[in-house]
């Protein structure tokens, strides 16, 4: 996962998990002051700063407060047995439209939970597992060696860039990670450059519209908010598959 403006160990002191259920907290306060984007930001990227909510960093993008993040000590949470029941990742992976030789980037790959499950679907392709935490990448390398998988490639990204060559990707996947990016505008711009024309973004986020999804508000997104942010970055909304238990499965095209 990507580390934002202030790193957070995603442990029980910051997010209480009981039988796979995450304790909810209050919604964020609105932003109160505009700030200039960094020099590397596209001209259209504007952030605001305000009071940070308990789970946020006090930085806002298109009115959404960016959440605190999951750190590498939470690998156990990413690899939990309940994930198949709660999120149906097998169903999500089967819904990816990937050619056998596709190159897909798993942005905020974390422990590689998705990357290693996508790997056999693209035997002549590659999964580029992008993360900015060296500890996550070390875990990925060790797991790849244990599994004998050679087409999952750990890749060190940056907080404001996927750090991949232009037009090098057929697709990109972001699973419960985008809402944590500390520089989402710059990340989307770099991803737009890295995707080939017609390349797809598969964006999975817990449904912010559904109060029954037991995830804290800042770690969820509505479809409307996701569309606002990605369409402003030049991506075309294609569809939102609705068969997953807790998550949106949104598809965008470059």
Identify the residue ranges that each predicted region occupies:
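A short acidic, Gly/Pro-enriched loop at the edge of an enzyme's catalytic core
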Residues: 162-171
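Conserved SAM-binding strand-loop segment of SAM-dependent methyltransferases
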Residues: 147-160
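A short glycine-rich, Lys/Arg-flanked "PGG" loop and its adjoining helix->strand segment in the class I
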Residues: 185-200
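Conserved SAM-binding loop of SAM-dependent methyltransferases across substrates and taxa
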Residues: 111-123
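Class I SAM-dependent transferase core
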Residues: 32-99, 103
């Amino acid at each position: 996962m990507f580390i934002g403006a202030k790193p957070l160990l995603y442990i029980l002191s910051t997010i209480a998990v009981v039988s796979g259920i995450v304790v909810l907290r209050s919604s964020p306060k609105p932003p109160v002051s505009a700030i200039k984007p960094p020099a590397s930001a596209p001209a259209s990227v504007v952030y605001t700063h305000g009071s940070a909510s308990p789970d946020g960093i006090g930085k806002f993008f298109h009115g959404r407060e960016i959440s605190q993040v999951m750190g590498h000590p939470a690998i156990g949470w990413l690899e939990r047995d309940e994930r198949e029941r709660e999120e149906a990742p097998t169903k999500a992976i089967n819904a990816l439209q990937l050619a056998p030789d596709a190159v897909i980037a798993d942005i905020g790959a974390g422990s590689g939970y998705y990357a290693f499950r996508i790997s056999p679907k693209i035997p002549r392709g590659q999964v580029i597992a992008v993360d900015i935490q060296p500890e996550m990448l070390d875990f990925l390398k060790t797991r790849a060696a244990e599994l004998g998988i050679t087409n999952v490639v750990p890749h060190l990204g940056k907080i404001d860039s996927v750090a991949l060559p232009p037009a090098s990707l057929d697709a990109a996947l972001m699973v419960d990670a985008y809402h944590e990016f500390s520089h989402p505008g710059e990340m989307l711009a770099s991803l737009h450059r890295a995707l080939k024309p017609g390349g797809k973004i598969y964006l999975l986020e817990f449904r912010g519209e559904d109060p029954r999804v037991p995830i804290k508000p800042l770690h969820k997104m509505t479809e409307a908010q996701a569309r606002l942010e990605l369409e402003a970055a030049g991506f075309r909304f294609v569809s939102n598959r609705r068969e997953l238990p807790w998550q949106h499965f949104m598809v965008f095209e470059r």
